[in-house]
Swiss-Prot record:
This is Lipoyl synthase. InterPro entries: Aldolase_TIM, Elp3/MiaA/NifB-like_rSAM, LIAS_N, Lipoyl_synth, rSAM. [4Fe-4S] cluster 2 binds at residues 60, 64, 67. GO terms for cellular component: cytoplasm. GO terms for molecular function: 4 iron, 4 sulfur cluster binding; lipoate synthase activity; metal ion binding. It is an enzyme of class 2 (transferase). Pathway: Protein modification; protein lipoylation via endogenous pathway; protein N(6)-(lipoyl)lysine from octanoyl-[acyl-carrier-protein]: step 2/2. Signal peptide: none annotated.
Length: 303
């Protein structure tokens, strides 16, 4: 694919806040998906002291064609990671934290218990901080959804990543309907937890396929949808088939809103945790507004 269009380009990070965040993460020996996945928004986010911490090590057991995270034999599980994560949240003064992880197919529960321990430690030291987790699919990990649901994150995010027709080439280790099932099960087990999912475009999908994914996610009771442009991390990854224009993203956002999502974020640089703190506040407000509208409708019907 030709060079990136102007609407994709971002400024190189150079603020003192960016380097302060970088130093803190390094000193606490934490991994971030911002660095590992070569996120284009790292400069903006770290300058605001926002970082998405990646737990369960830095090596993934899968090799998705879109992802820049290292693959191979995973690290040993670090029992002290939840405490270090909680310390970082406290030192950064985060009001909202996003926690993600590599896939850990080697673990009996896929790392679900470790996620729960991280949530618990943050609740102890920063009880007013809201917690969003972005998890792997826990494929063939019985009981993992229950562990996560019982931990009660404020937001549960699991990305379907792409349309089902591209799974064999882009996300070969995953199963589309397993991802939908996980999202549905979390909402069923903990209805009060907001659910969220995201996908990339520009991999060769058809618009009709993207719309079908929207319908599938709403069927799974997903509250929040994110859609962003796929960017090729290295020449060894899947090539960009198309750079979707900002106007096309606006169209996708309009269509998604008609499906009934509480929140939709769709733009070239949208990523799962981009502006997550601000979006969470909007998500809560949209929920309150919809709930009030539903109550009014019920009252009118009764009267």
């Amino acid at each position: 694919m030709s060079k990136r269009p102007d609407w994709i380009k971002v400024k190189a990070p150079n603020s003192s806040e960016y380097y302060n965040t970088k130093d803190l993460i390094k000193n606490l020996k934490l991994n971030t998906v911002c660095e590992e996945a070569a996120c284009p928004n790292i400069g903006e986010c770290w300058s605001k002291k926002h970082a998405t911490v990646m737990i369960l090590g830095s090596v993934c057991t899968r090799a998705c064609r879109f992802c820049n995270v290292k693959t191979g034999r995973p690290d040993l599980l670090d029992p002290h990671e939840p405490q270090r994560l909680a310390e970082a949240v406290q030192k950064l003064g985060l009001k909202h934290v996003v926690i993600t992880s590599v896939d850990r197919d080697d673990l009996e529960d896929g790392g679900a218990t470790h996620f729960a321990e991280c949530i618990s430690e943050i609740r102890k030291s920063s009880p007013n901080t809201t917690i969003e987790i972005l998890t792997p699919d826990f494929l063939r990990k019985d009981g993992a959804a229950e562990i996560i649901a019982n931990a009660k994150p404020d937001v549960f995010n699991h990305n379907v990543e792409t349309v089902p027709s591209l799974y064999n080439t882009i996300r070969p280790g995953a199963r589309y309907y397993n991802s939908l099932s996980l999202l549905h099960n979390i909402k069923k087990l903990s209805p009060e937890v907001f659910t969220k999912s995201g996908m990339m475009v520009g991999l060769g999908e058809e618009i009709s396929e993207v719309v079908q994914v929207m319908d599938d996610l709403r069927e799974a009771k997903v509250d929040f949808l994110t859609i962003g442009q796929y960017l090729q991390p290295t020449k060894n990854h899947a090539e960009v088939a198309k750079y979707v224009t900002p106007e096309e993203f606006k169209y996708l956002e309009r269509v998604a809103r008609t499906k009934g999502f509480l929140m939709v974020s769709a733009s070239p640089l949208t990523r799962s945790s981009y502006h997550a703190d601000e979006d969470f506040e909007k998500l809560k407000e949209n929920y309150r507004h919809r709930h009030c509208e539903e109550r009014r409708s019920i009252d009118v019907a009764i009267s």
